[in-house]
């Protein structure tokens, strides 16, 4: 295998130049992991065996689930275990955002498909912090370094990642074509009209 961190001189220099030199041991360990033959194989498998929709079970009942190859879950689990999704917020200190960005790059450059939920989770934290209720409910799960691939609602999970639903059938990837609306119903309730894919 290859140490994807230590052999990347510009990344090593940037980590030190911008105050995150303290993170070099963690970044080196992650660099060795993502450069290993087994991680590279998982990246290959995750992109060869793409997600598939499971709309209905064998009796015809709606599922609306997405099935992923186990390799994808191993990659996502490793990124979460290394804090690529929230370490800068969970353990704030000088250079923490630089260290997290470097960690994110190490994982995303090998398998970019998992980068979306990892980066969205990182980006969602400041918005969640604006609400004491939401922060109290979600941040402990987001700051967790564990990853559970089982489909369950938030009450049955000790960790969480954040995603977004922007695509609508009439718009495809054109977000401007969205027609879904939300009307505040009081308290923490909204009435949503439309649907997302």
Question: Predicted regions span which residues?
Answer:
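Extended, charge-enriched "interface" segments that sit outside catalytic cores
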Residues: 1-93, 112
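Glycine-rich flavin
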Residues: 68-197
């Amino acid at each position: 295998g290859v140490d994807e961190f230590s052999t990347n001189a510009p990344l090593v220099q940037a980590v030190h130049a911008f105050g995150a030199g303290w993170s070099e041991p963690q970044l080196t360990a992650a660099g060795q992991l993502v450069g290993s033959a087994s991680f590279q194989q998982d990246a290959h498998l995750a992109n060869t065996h793409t997600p598939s929709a499971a709309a209905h079970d064998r009796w015809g009942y709606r599922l609306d689930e997405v099935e992923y190859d186990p390799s994808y879950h191993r990659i996502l689990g490793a990124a979460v275990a290394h804090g690529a999704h929230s370490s800068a917020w969970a353990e704030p200190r000088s250079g923490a955002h630089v260290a997290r960005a470097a960690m994110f790059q190490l994982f995303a450059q090998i398998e970019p498909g998992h980068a979306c939920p990892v980066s969205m989770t990182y980006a969602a934290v400041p918005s969640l912090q604006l609400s004491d209720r939401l922060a109290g409910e979600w941040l402990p799960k987001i700051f967790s370094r564990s990853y559970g691939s089982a489909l369950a609602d938030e009450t049955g999970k000790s960790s969480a990642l954040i995603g977004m639903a922007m695509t609508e059938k009439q718009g495809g990837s054109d977000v401007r074509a969205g027609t879904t609306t939300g009307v505040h119903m009081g308290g923490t309730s909204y009435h949503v009209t439309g649907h997302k894919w």
